[in-house]
């Protein structure tokens, strides 16, 4: 399972060159264009279009953080303790910045991720199922962490 996720990331590398930065901003452009109902989580950026997002310095950085998180999760999937610890480390900054996501979004992210990934390469059923399984493990840990913190879960 982890191998399929890691292999699929070859087309969406992190980095500092124009192409790799675009990998991250293109995810957020897709999110803003196809899921405008989620824009309210991006305070101060709610009215941006996908085209605006691609030019935003904020989303250039945020896109790299998101890509890096997906890379790290895929590489840690066969190390359950580290995978769970990293999932918790993703939740904590959201709480510190008062970005209280609806609990269902921790799992609903993954179909959006797959939609984006399919713009970069052909995503076969094995890869799709691998990402959805990873996403379920991730979401389960995020929700457990939120529960332990007394947050909505």
Swiss-Prot record:
Q: Where in the cell is it found?
A: Cytoplasm
Q: What tissue specificity is annotated for this entry? A: Body wall globin is localized in cellular compartments belonging to the hypodermis, the dorsal, ventral and lateral cords, the nerve ring, and body wall muscle.
Residue span, Globin domain: 1-147
Which Gene3D superfamilies does the record cross-reference, listed alphabetically?
Globins
Q: How is the protein modified post-translationally, according to the record?
A: The N-terminus is blocked.
Highest taxon of the lineage = Eukaryota
* A Pfam short name: Globin
Q: Which UniProt keywords apply?
A: Cytoplasm, Disulfide bond, Heme, Iron, Metal-binding, Oxygen transport, Transport
Q: Which GO terms describe its molecular function?
A: heme binding; iron ion binding; oxygen binding; oxygen carrier activity
**One CC-aspect GO term:** cytoplasm
Binding site residues for heme b: 94
The record ties this protein, via InterPro entries, to: Globin (IPR000971), Globin-like_sf (IPR009050), Globin/Proto (IPR012292), Globin_nematode (IPR012085), Mb-like_M (IPR044399)
Q: Which CDD domains match?
A: Mb-like
Q: Which family does it belong to?
A: Belongs to the globin family.
Q: How does it assemble?
A: Homodimer; disulfide-linked.
> What's this protein's function?
High oxygen affinity. Probably supplies oxygen needed for muscle activity.
Protein name per UniProt? Myoglobin
């Amino acid at each position: 399972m982890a191998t399929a996720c890691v292999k699929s990331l070859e087309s969406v590398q992190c980095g500092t060159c124009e192409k790799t930065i675009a990998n991250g901003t293109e995810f957020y452009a897709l999110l803003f264009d196809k899921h405008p109902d989620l824009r309210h989580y991006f305070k101060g950026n709610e009215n941006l279009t996908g085209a605006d997002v691609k030019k935003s310095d904020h989303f250039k950085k945020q896109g790299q953080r998101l890509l890096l998180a997906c890379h790290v999760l895929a590489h840690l999937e066969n190390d359950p303790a580290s995978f769970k610890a990293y999932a918790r480390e993703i939740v904590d900054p959201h709480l510190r910045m008062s970005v209280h996501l609806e609990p269902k979004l921790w799992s609903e992210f993954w179909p959006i991720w797959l939609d984006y990934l399919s713009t970069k390469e052909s995503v076969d059923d094995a890869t799709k199922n691998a990402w959805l399984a990873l996403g379920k493990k991730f979401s389960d840990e995020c929700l457990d962490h939120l529960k332990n913190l007394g947050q909505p879960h």
